[in-house]
A protein has these predicted regions:
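Vicinal oxygen chelate
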Residues: 56-59, 103, 112-189
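Positively charged n-region of N-terminal signal peptides that target proteins for export
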Residues: 1-6
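Residue-level detector of high-confidence beta-strand sites
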Residues: 74-76, 163, 195
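Bacterial N-terminal signal peptides
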Residues: 7-18
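Core segments of cupin and vicinal oxygen chelate
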Residues: 43, 53-104, 200
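N-terminal low-complexity, Pro/Thr/Ser-rich intrinsically disordered segments
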Residues: 25-51
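Boundary at the C-terminal end of the N-terminal hydrophobic targeting segment
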Residues: 21-23
Length: 201
């Protein structure tokens, strides 16, 4: 039986390579700097700009994504609106974090019941179902895996699935093998994350 997990990880690595090249190409364009974020995004006919995670405790999420992974907050707003089904105001908090590019690989964090700590949404059971249908995987490439890993593993709510270890994948079009240090863990809400480092030597 084919190693489907290995194939999926290889596919994720391929996507990560592509995203890295895209980011390097577009971030070097000096003409971009005069454009607003909305104007920059409008330049592309189709752009997977952001993945937004619905979270239980946005501060716990920030402890991982900002403090441990090193992402940068580029948007942080509280939004008040009438609740759709209850006679009260709903207050949500929405945060965007960037990695190394303003328009590729942005993570959104949203708490739909921010300021209501007793709301049932905050105590919803956490699913940790691994590599199964319906469960996304967030894949990060880093050049600082060994440096960041101890902080990540010690972050409250994080569950380690696999500590960093070397994996080798077939190269492109018969080229040299691709060596990757792979780590896998769950974030505080049960989202599965890979933090990988491509071995270049």
């Amino acid at each position: 039986m084919p190693n489907l997990k290995g194939f999926f990880l290889l596919l994720c690595t391929t996507i990560a390579f592509t995203s890295t090249a895209f980011a390097a190409h577009h971030s070097s364009d000096d003409g971009e700097s005069a454009l607003s974020p909305i104007e920059k995004a409008a330049e592309y006919p189709l752009l997977l700009r952001r993945t937004t995670l619905i979270v239980r405790d946005i501060e716990a999420s920030l402890a991982l994504y900002e403090a441990a992974l090193g992402m940068e907050i580029i948007y942080d707003e509280q939004i008040a609106r009438p609740h759709a089904s209850e006679d009260r105001e709903q207050r949500l908090r929405l945060i965007f974090l960037r990695a190394s590019h303003d328009h590729v690989g942005v993570i959104g964090l949203i708490d739909y019941e921010y300021g209501y700590p007793e709301h049932p949404a905050h105590s919803k059971p956490i699913r940790q179902e691994g590599f199964t249908p319906g469960n996304p995987i967030l894949l990060f490439n880093t050049q600082e895996l060994n440096t960041r890993w101890p902080t990540i593993a010690a972050t409250p709510g994080v569950k380690v699935v696999k500590a960093p270890g070397l994996r080798t994948y077939p190269g492109y079009d018969g080229g040299p093998d691709i060596k990757v240090m792979v780590s896998i863990f769950y974030d505080p809400d049960g989202y599965l994350i890979e933090l990988n480092q491509i071995v270049t030597e």
